[in-house]
Swiss-Prot record, chains A, B:
Pfam families: HIGH_NTase1 (PF05636)
Entry-linked Gene3D superfamilies: HUPs
Catalytic reaction(s) noted: cytidine(34) in elongator tRNA(Met) + acetate + ATP = N(4)-acetylcytidine(34) in elongator tRNA(Met) + AMP + diphosphate
Top EC category: ligase
The UniProt record lists the keyword Cytoplasm: yes
Binding site for ATP: 7-20, 101, 152, 177
GO biological process, one term: tRNA modification
Annotated EC: 6.3.4.-
The keyword tRNA-binding is annotated on this UniProt entry: yes
The protein, known as: tRNA(Met) cytidine acetate ligase
Family, similarity comment: Belongs to the TmcAL family.
Keywords on record: ATP-binding, Cytoplasm, Ligase, Nucleotide-binding, RNA-binding, tRNA processing, tRNA-binding
């Protein structure tokens, strides 16, 4: 069986994702669609709108055959590490092709990656008033003429770099992003595809009617069940404030990605009087030109999760393939992959795993439940992968 | 000027405290009444109902001349350390007499303390199914014939032991507890004095009318302002659960008074599914016969405050006299005491002190604000001691 891989967050699952799945099959002629998906927290350091099981269910109901969790230590990372983690898992599963959306689908990203500057080189890295990504893009443009600035292009570049680094046989296929830019914050009533961020914004504002045209019906059902994190900030901020006011500067300084004395600023702002009244105003108060919003938010999430540098480095050395769900076809593919994969396949998490390799995902699941309006089912211990069958689909309708 | 010392929590300030102040003056003929008072957290490991400034105001309005904060590292402790901390501060202030309520006011507690067994001795300490305090009381009874079991007697015994340990010149004066036992959970409409715990219970149930007869009017005004912690458990439990789910067992094991592997039980219960739904059910699930309710609750508070054994031991080596408020008479007494006291007198807390000696009180104040229905004013930085004058009193009426 030939498998095509997708790197996804499905936050939430929407019509654009259905188009992506259809195109992936059409472009590659694959029999099986495998999605590597962020778990309960997404790349920008936020809880996913719905938990990983709900999003797995949506993916399986709409054409994906196998959903593998991108572990938290890969998912909540800058794009190059996010991309490398995903490519590593897909390579281990024997996937031959990866199809992704891009703002510049005609660009040969693998070729671009081959010409890319090494991270340390170039004078652009001296500038203080820009983020690392901006500095890197400036350097890349001066050497190749291509301006790497759109989010899907940046991810595509990350996949290409990862393929080179890992010596992976995966072939990349870009499809042109249509209708909705990643950062578009609004959409019209006659659109059938909208960006995930604009959908989240509409849901946050309670505009369910507006969202109807751009998501499968199940997403509307899920949002009405209250087991979601649309309003997570009202829970996130008191917990973060509590953490910042009780940990020592020394403890905060050990948090993953806490760099350049950022811990001092975080503590000073959190403990100030009257102090920020919301998560958004806190981030505004601590943000500098050196960091992107997402970078700050990821660091704050790692602060909240109490993840230290050494724990993170150890975890990243030890990846695994956590199976969240499959169709019959996905199961058949898995049976073949079992014999060849070099990474451990995990279908059930017990107390031992929750304290060892999967500790970070386990903590993330517990935190997700705490941030959701209703905690719902536990996320890891004793949960079985979803086996999605056509009968099941009918039952759901 | 002759000063009498009172060891207090004023949680909340009630008519029994007025009686205590009057008796203290009558028994000793003192000119000045000095109260050492728990700060924002009380001995049983709970946030005080009102913050330390509100309670200081009530004390000054009702006959106390000087209020000194009992630092958190003394206040939130078993009774012998609580008592020793208070006696240490009162001794440093040149206080000659301490007057306290007792269930057995005719007992000579100093004499009892002289006959007391040393902590290590005796076979009663071998029993596993009792608390340390029970074991000690059993041993004491077998040697002296006196059954030390009532809470105010236990504190009195603590004062006496402290006087011996510190070689303090303080003389103890017991007054018989009247009308309300420490643990009485109810009171009748014709009572004018009720126990603090029964008053807290009535306030928790929203029975303001019932409380009118046993507290000064100001307490009723304070409860209506929402800057109080009557419902603290609904805030306390999610924060504690969050702490237990994100810290490692190693980190939890370093918390002050975390003994005999208790951290494993706390984490296992907190992370279990479905898990306790409230703070009370959590405590019930983790409590054993080896620990009193108060002991468990103090340990949980130190867990929430993230206070480690070494930090606590260092803090206890370095006590101070934090001035919360005074009358003119109290101020005059302070001016004299300044010249002779061996402990630092602190009237204003800046960022430096908040990060050094007073760090624990500072954190406790921040946590108190987080647990209160409305956070109110900040508790430490730049707060001035209350200077209470008669004009001020009139203004308040």
């Amino acid at each position: 069986m030939k498998a095509v891989g997708l790197v996804t967050e499905y936050n939430p699952f929407h019509n654009g994702h259905i188009y992506h799945i259809q195109q992936a099959k059409a472009v590659t002629g694959a029999d099986v669609v495998i999605a590597v998906m962020s778990g309960n927290f997404v790349q920008r350091g936020e809880p996913a709108l719905f938990d990983k099981w709900t999003r797995t269910q949506a993916a399986l109901a709409n054409g994906v055959d196998l959903v593998i969790e991108l572990p938290t230590f890969y998912a909540v990372q800058p794009s190059h590490l996010f991309a490398e983690g995903a490519i590593k898992l897909l390579t281990a599963l024997g996937v031959e092709d990866v199809v992704f959306g891009s703002e510049h689908a005609t660009v040969d990203f693998l070729n671009l990656a081959k010409q890319a500057p090494s991270v340390q080189g170039g004078k652009a890295f001296q500038e203080k008033n820009q983020t690392f990504a901006q500095a890197y893009a400036t350097q890349l443009e001066s050497e190749t003429g291509f301006k790497l600035e759109d989010p899907n292009d940046i991810l595509a570049f990350g996949y290409a770099k990862a393929i080179l680094n890992l010596n992976s046989p995966i072939k990349l296929h870009a499809i042109q992003r249509v209708a909705a830019g990643y950062h578009d914050q609004s959409f019209t009533d006659d659109q059938t595809i909208a960006s995930a961020s604009s959908i989240r914004l509409a849901l946050h504002k309670g505009k369910l009617e507006k969202v109807k045209g751009v998501v499968p019906n199940q997403t509307l059902v899920d949002i009405s069940s209250a087991n979601h994190t649309v309003d997570f900030e009202s829970q996130f901020w008191p917990l973060l404030k509590y953490r910042l006011m009780t940990d020592t500067i020394g403890q905060l300084g050990q948090v993953y990605q806490m760099a350049e004395g950022l811990e001092h600023r975080l503590a000073a702002v959190a403990l100030g009087e009257p102090g920020p009244q919301s998560y958004q105003s806190f981030i505004k108060a601590v943000k500098s030109k050196r960091y992107t919003f997402a970078r700050i938010q990821r660091t704050l999430l790692y602060t909240l999760l109490n993840v230290k540098v050494d724990q993170m480095q150890a975890a990243m050395q030890d990846p695994y393939l956590r199976i969240l769900g499959f169709t019959d076809k996905g199961q058949a593919y898995l049976n073949g992959a079992k014999k060849t994969t070099t990474l451990p396949l995990i279908s059930k998490v017990d107390q031992h795993l929750a304290k060892a390799n999967l500790r970070l995902d386990f903590k993330a699941g517990k935190l997700w439940q705490l941030l959701a309006r209703e905690p719902g089912q536990q996320q890891d211990i004793a949960r079985q992968p979803i086996h999605f069958t056509q009968a099941h689909t009918k039952e759901d309708k």
